[in-house]
A protein has these predicted regions:
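Acidic (E/D-rich), amphipathic helical modules within compact regulatory domains
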Residues: 19-82
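Short, solvent-exposed interaction modules
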Residues: 63, 67-119
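A common structural junction motif
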Residues: 25-31, 59-69, 110-116, 138-151, ...
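Short amphipathic alpha-helix segments
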Residues: 12-29, 57-58, 98-114, 529, ...
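Glycine/proline-enriched, intrinsically flexible loops and inter-domain linkers
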Residues: 97, 117, 122, 128, ...
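Short glycine-/aliphatic-rich beta-strand segments at the starts of folded cytosolic domains
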Residues: 1-11, 37-44, 84-96, 121-126, ...
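Helix N-cap motif at beta-to-alpha junctions
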Residues: 46-51, 129-136, 569-576
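Short, surface-exposed ligand-recognition loops at beta-strand->loop->(often short) alpha-helix junctions
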Residues: 7-16, 48, 91-102, 129-132, ...
Length: 693
């Protein structure tokens, strides 16, 4: 397989490099005098020998890889000019298996020129200044790359130029040894061992929940049925992972649904509410209250609440609005850019999967972070272990939401920033999308209703499945620490999502499917598992699912939240037309199974049954969480920060100094420079502009 390297040298300096130099000097106290960068691509062509591939790319490089006015490309060693004589060189590229949008776009561009090749991208950063190795490594890992998802290498000048990087090209490949036989998880163990199983597998299940699962598989009727199916008595890893995903805090909102025994002390000066049992914050105080208000006040504009991927409200006589907001905190703490990008694209997908598919028309966000300068104020060693430092979270999260909206053609129309020290442990990344939904389709169906039918084919459309996104649902229920799983972090692909979105809305108007939902935090487990409740059962074959690379196990295929994926119920007679439209629009579509009325979620890998879960147990078997709440009066807020870590800036000698200090606080200072990076004009429908223009 031929692999060649192409480098793109900018002819115009970028402001980003100047910004990184300022950050290194201001926040890291490192005198980085100048930095330049070069984008590089590794191009792998299975159908071509190396000289032939070099010739092809040499003729077409200006069409795909660079703008000849602002940059130039090279396929062989060349004079580095402005990049000469750096102190250190940093190479940053995505780890194998991590979504590489730049490389993917380049591969798509080559395909348009009838060149079949895989492309991986990366960057070279040339650091100039009186730096030592430790300082160069600090700049590399704090400002240029993220070890969680990227390979970051720091070379001295001599080391870098000693290697002929154009002749020794290795294309990044994921190498996994597939274990296609499911693993049996024996639950006939002690309580301590049950808790350890949950911890080791990142299931986020409590001991009570593990025992409920254990008792289910000890049931004689269950054992009898499983024996006839040639399944082990105890759950397979596929079954246990599906249960953990379905019962996760992310999907079931167990704390919101918990029964609460409330009591209080008789505190003078405060009104007593009295001891009471609350059936759950969600059920009693949110859902029931909403239903009661809807009935008592005749709120006929509430079309769908608490039952779909987003709420649906009536806008006028022909259009309904869909609204969805969601947090994406834990992934954004580990990989700020990827976590936030995944978050905003996720709520876009929720809108696409609402009813029979709505069109996203606006994004919104609220960010709560620790103050950006906290690391400099208290020292990095005093920050919580696990999350990135606050400034990197702010910059990465903002860029992720910016790219998610701008590159998908969805305007960001409102939002907020808030800063407080306690968000150093876990930021709040609150993202939302508004969608427009026609009330009727051309065939007369109500667009707000989903009606999957038995015998409908199960199609998976959009992105392929990878290891990124595994345990996204359960991971978000756990405390962040240095052992948080890297596979729970993924990077979205706005290009694939845009194509999938346009295709889906076209298929909707042609009446090609009966129901749709997104592949949320549990991938096929959540989408097929939820849609199966409409018909009473489903059967799928995981071996039919497209993969980013070979070697994924059945449970990984089932629960991975690969981005830009939807599950669609297609009537049998519409299958060929659905596939033809997908091919014409450049969208991957795979027929992986069928909905039925059997009462089970049956999962195969080829001819082997790897999981068979009763839908009633899967969706209704979760034991209710019981909590006790006691109010014993107001408490003084305590800080996790050690005394003296943050300088007291009070006692300014002049009003001017005090005012300047006040106006520079992160919650008061202008956010205009951040907000203006959002595209709020795309789709040409934003009437009230930011900052009055």
């Amino acid at each position: 397989m031929a692999v060649i390297r192409l480098e793109v040298e900018p002819l115009i300096p970028t402001l980003k490099n100047d910004s990184i130099c300022r950050q290194a000097q201001q926040f890291l106290n490192i005198k980085l005098e100048r930095m330049s960068e070069i984008q590089f691509y590794l191009i792998s062509g299975a159908e071509h020998k190396k000289p032939e591939l070099q010739e092809l790319i040499g003729k077409t490089g200006h069409e795909v890889f660079c703008d000849p006015i602002t940059s130039r490309y090279q396929l062989r060693s060349y004079d580095l000019g402005q990049h000469q004589d750096p102190q250190f060189v940093v190479e940053v590229s995505y780890k194998p298996g991590v979504t590489d949008n730049t490389g993917h776009s380049a591969s798509e561009g080559l395909k348009l020129l009838e060149i079949s090749a895989e492309v991986a991208s990366g960057k070279l950063y040339f650091l100039h200044g009186n730096l030592n190795l430790g300082e160069a490594q600090t700049v590399a890992f704090e400002l240029l790359g993220n070890e969680l998802i990227e390979n970051v290498f720091v070379y001295s000048y001599k080391e870098f130029f000693h290697v002929d990087r154009f002749s020794e090209c290795i294309f990044p490949k994921v190498v996994l040894k597939a274990k296609l036989e499911p693993e049996t998880i024996t639950l006939n163990v002690t309580n301590a061992e049950l808790e350890q199983i949950s911890l080791d597998r990142c299931l986020a299940l409590t001991l009570d929940e593990m025992n409920v699962i254990k008792n289910y598989f000890e049931n004689e009727e269950v054992i009898k049925k499983r024996t006839t199916q040639n399944l082990p008595i105890w759950p397979t890893d596929v079954e246990l992972e599906v249960l953990a995903q379905t019962w996760s805090e992310h999907c079931k909102h167990k704390i919101f649904a918990a029964k609460i025994n409330y009591s209080e002390e008789n505190i003078k000066g405060y009104k007593r509410l009295g001891q009471q049992n609350i059936g759950g914050l969600y059920k009693d105080l949110i859902k029931n209250s909403t239903k009661r208000i809807e009935k008592e006040q005749g709120k006929d504009w509430l079309i769908s609440v608490f039952s779909d991927n987003a709420g649906i409200v009536r806008f006028d006589n022909s259009i309904d609005l869909c609204i969805k907001v969601e947090t994406h905190n834990s992934p954004s703490a580990l990989d700020p850019y990827g976590g936030a990008l995944t978050g905003i694209l996720g709520v876009n997908r929720d809108i696409l999967g609402c009813g029979l598919g709505a069109r996203p028309i606006a994004n919104m966000d609220v960010f709560c972070f620790a103050p950006p300068a906290l690391a400099e104020q208290i020292g990095r060693d005093n920050l919580p272990v696990g999350p990135k430092e606050p400034r990197r979270i702010l910059e990465g999260v903002h860029l992720g939401v910016e790219d998610g909206g701008n590159k998908s053609g969805i305007p960001t129309v409102n939002g907020a920033f808030f800063f407080e020290e306690n968000f150093a442990g876990k930021p709040l990344v609150f993202v939302g999308t508004v969608g427009a939904l026609p009330q009727k389709l051309p065939d007369g169906r109500n667009t707000s209703s989903k009606n999957a039918n038995s015998k409908d084919r199960i199609f998976m459309i959009g992105g392929a499945i990878g290891a990124d996104g595994i345990h996204g649902a359960t991971f978000s229920s756990l405390e962040l620490n240095e052992n948080s799983p890297a596979t729970a972090v993924q990077i979205g692909d706005p290009l694939t999502q845009k194509r999938t979105s346009d295709f889906l809305l076209e298929a909707r108007d042609l009446g090609l499917y009966s129901s749709v939902t997104d592949n949320g935090a549990g991938g096929l487990s959540s989408s097929v598992g939820e849609m199966a409740t409409m018909t009473g059962g489903a059967e799928i074959d995981l071996s039919l699912c497209p993969m980013k690379y070979p070697g994924l196990t059945p449970y990984e295929l089932m629960i991975s939240e690969s981005q830009e994926r939807m599950t669609v119920a297609v009537p049998p007679l519409k299958g060929e037309e659905f596939l033809a439209l997908a091919k014409a629009r450049g969208v991957s579509a795979s027929d992986i199974g069928e909905f039925n009325q059997g009462g089970y979620l049956s999962i195969y890998y080829g001819k082997n049954l790897v999981a068979d879960l009763e839908l009633d147990f899967l969706h209704d078997g979760l034991p209710s969480m019981n909590l006790c709440a006691k109010w014993d009066g107001p408490r003084i807020k305590e800080s996790w920060l050690k005394d003296g870590l943050i300088e007291n800036k009070g006692g300014k000698t002049t009003i001017k100094e005090g005012l300047n200090s006040l106006l520079s606080r992160p919650n008061i200072v202008s956010k205009e420079s951040w907000v203006r990076r959002y595209d709020h004009e795309v789709q040409a429908a934003t009437h009230i502009k930011f900052f009055g223009i």
